Amino acid sequence: KITSMNFRLYSLFLLSLIALFSISCNNSRRIVTHANPDKKPTNIILMIGDGMSTPQITASMISNEKRTSFERFPYSGLVKTHSKSNKITDSAAGGTAIATGHKTNNGMIGMNADSIAVPSILELLSDKGKKTGILVTCRVNHATPAAFISKNINRNNYYEIANDIANTEKLDLLMGGGRKYFIDRNDGKNLIDTMISKGWTYYDTI
């Protein structure tokens, strides 16, 4: 049986534990940064690891004997990238959330859930006269990179996405795979030739 006196003592004990925990947290090692908030960055590089979140970064920190590059960054933040249609996102909806700030349905790229095209941060920076580029280890018309430059209701429309990439005026550098979607096409177009005619310099090896 819990009496009023016992309840008060129990509550006091819990409050004491919380206070001690708060003090221990406040005395933990502080991370001091030397970032200058008034200094504007020369370049912005957005790195996206496929399926990567804080658990993967933590695992890297634990397994790596040396300090990881992530720990050298002066700032860190979190962003929700789940899709409008599912709590478990795919690369298309996740990439669109990062690129545009808009939630969309799984499978859709560069547009919101109502199928309305929305600008990406890459496109907005290009409009301000900044040089932009995409460098990937996958196909350049894959869902994640495509979310920054293409608008399509289906991430699997690789040939349509390749056409968007070839005809954009908001991209200055493109490196990655997926060459066949630019040349082996049912419409007979050679999108690599199209890009060269627009002033691109093409290399098929490094």
What are these regions (language model features)?
Residues I2-F13:
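Bacterial N-terminal signal peptides that target proteins for export
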